Curated annotation (Swiss-Prot):
Subcellular location: Cytoplasm
Keyword Cytoplasm appears in the UniProt entry: yes
GO annotation, biological process: histidyl-tRNA aminoacylation
Family of the protein in this entry: Belongs to the class-II aminoacyl-tRNA synthetase family.
Catalytic activity: tRNA(His) + L-histidine + ATP = L-histidyl-tRNA(His) + AMP + diphosphate + H(+)
Protein name, per record: Histidine--tRNA ligase
Entry-linked InterPro entries: aa-tRNA-synth_II, aa-tRNA-synth_II/BPL/LPL, Anticodon-bd, Anticodon-bd_dom_sf, His-tRNA-ligase, HisRS-like_core, HisRS/HisZ, HisRS_anticodon
Main location, first listed in the record: cytoplasm
Keyword Nucleotide-binding: yes
Length: 480
């Protein structure tokens, strides 16, 4: 007999946790749509030569390739005959949602309206080394605004407002969107003589590690043989990236002070101007100033970011790390089209976020179900009545489960409690003879009678009240 088990790097949830995960997905989707983003889905696998526009490297080593049994047999036969392998398998599982988006926009460019505002919430796959908190299959929840030839910096501010709306409704604790601009960093490095090119990109990647590895690590790396930057210059870099703002006015003041002290090179001036405009628009969009700040160490390790960059963290749980990140890029689909398609976007890695929240004790004792009511069956002769009651509840929009076999009432209550069903409807001989049914509220441990024809309307009121209770408890995301 084969032992049932899931592959390493997979998060599989029991129903109660799956409901909580699904509700997080629903909140994210709802807020994306409120800001006018349109849904798309792309295939779980893409053509290998399309997905892997840059051959080799870490990305290709983590890609899962897809091969049919027929193709495998043909490859094996060819190998037996001494033939060379025909190259990579034809298909590969997507490793993020950005590359499929680039292919999608390039392929459908003439059918889309620009700026194209898209959201996508799907699983992606990476051959990560199996270890705690690292996943091979995980959900990403992305938004991007794609322009044609140009895209206003105003969208960068709107994306920050989307981040705020999502995490405010998720209710998982206070959070802060940390904001920076790659042009500002590049301009500052240029003022120190760290010229644009591979060296500057490498320095940016090291600076981005400062919150994880610490200033001493970054200092030793930049002064070391690989970089050879003078200690005095490294000290200025570390002092610069240590800057943080406290409040909206302080953020603007820091930009002004930076402009005066360093001198506005063309690149630095662009970065300051873009950040200043984003800050002003974020205020107009109603994002509270406690929810964002400038953090000059945020660079994002991916080299295609060219302007605004974001990282979001939980204020009281910084050990969780970034829970949402992204930024602006100049050309999304340069490998697939000659059109210039600048954009800005962010991604929420929901699988990892959910796992970390659970590990940190921020999701506790979820006792809810998608089933809103259960109709108990105590007597076989009352099955028709029970089915009719359930049918009427469903017509009223109430998710209703029926016990199809008669059991003792106590056992049916136990089942409902274990399943997280709050309301149990009892329709026994005594109740039906009086034209009523009994409703047991398992949370409040109260039972009351209600006229049979008023059951649906009464339960709708009770469910609305229960929903209000859940909101006051951050709907089951109970903070430690």
């Amino acid at each position: 007999m084969i032992k049932p088990r899931t592959p390493p790097g997979i998060m599989e949830l029991l129903p109660r946790e799956q409901i909580a995960f699904q509700r997080m997905l629903d909140v994210i989707r709802r807020n994306y749509e409120r800001f006018g983003f349109l849904p798309i889905e792309t295939p779980v696998f893409e053509l290998s030569d399309v997905l892997l526009t840059k051959s080799g490297g870490e990305t290709e080593r983590q890609v899962y390739f897809v091969q049919s049994t027929g193709a495998l047999a043909n490859a094996a036969a060819a190998a037996d005959e001494g033939a060379e392998n025909g190259g990579l398998p034809e298909l590969a599982l997507r490793f993020d949602l950005t590359v499929p988006l680039a292919r999608y926009v390039a392929e459908h460019e003439h059918d889309l309206s620009f700026p194209f505002r898209r959201y996508q919430m799907q699983r992606v796959y990476r051959g990560e080394r199996a270890q705690r908190g690292r996943f091979r299959e995980f959900y990403q929840c992305d938004i991007d605004v794609i322009g044609k030839d140009a895209l206003s910096i105003r969208y960068d501010a709107e994306v920050l407002a989307v981040i705020h709306a999502v995490f405010a409704e998720l209710g998982i604790g206070d959070f802060k969107v940390q904001l920076n601009n790659r042009k500002l960093l590049r301009g500052f490095f240029e003022s120190l003589g760290v010229a644009e090119g591979e060296l500057q990109l490498a320095v940016l990647r090291e600076v981005d590690k400062i919150d994880k590895r610490g200033a001493d690590y970054v200092r030793d790396t930049l002064v070391g043989e690989g970089f050879g930057i003078a200690a005095e210059q490294v000290a200025r870099i570390l002092a610069f990236v240590a800057l943080r703002s406290e409040g909206h006015a302080d953020a603007l003041a820091q930009l002004q002070a930076l402009e005066a002290s360093v001198g506005a090179s063309a690149t630095l001036g662009e970065g300051i101007a873009e950040l200043r405009e984003v800050l002003e628009l974020v205020k107009a969009l109603g994002v509270p100033e406690r929810a964002y700040c400038l953090n000059f160490s945020i660079a994002r390790g991916l080299d295609y970011y060219t302007g605004t960059v974001y990282e979001t963290t939980l204020t009281d749980h910084p050990q969780i790390g970034s829970i949402c990140s992204g930024g602006r890029y100049e050309s999304l689909a340069s490998h697939y089209t000659k059109s210039r398609l600048p954009g800005v976007g962010i991604s929420i890695g929901l699988t990892r976020l959910f796992w970390q929240l659970r590990e940190a004790g921020l999701i506790q004792g979820i006792a809810e179900s998608s089933v809103q009511a259960m109709v108990a069956l105590m007597d076989e002769t009352r099955l028709d009545d029970v089915l009719d009651i359930a049918r009427r509840l469903r017509i009223a929009g109430i998710n209703t489960e029926v016990q199809m076999e008669p059991k003792k009432v106590g056992k049916q209550f136990q089942y409902a409690a274990r399943a997280g069903i709050r309301f149990v409807v009892l329709a026994g001989d005594d109740e039906l003879a009086r034209g009523v049914v009994a409703v047991k509220d398992l949370v409040r441990e109260q039972q009351f009678d209600v006229a049979r024809d008023e059951l649906a309307s009464t339960l709708l009121v009770e469910l609305e009240q229960a929903k209000g209770d859940a909101v006051r408890r951050s709907w089951s995301f109970l903070l430690a």
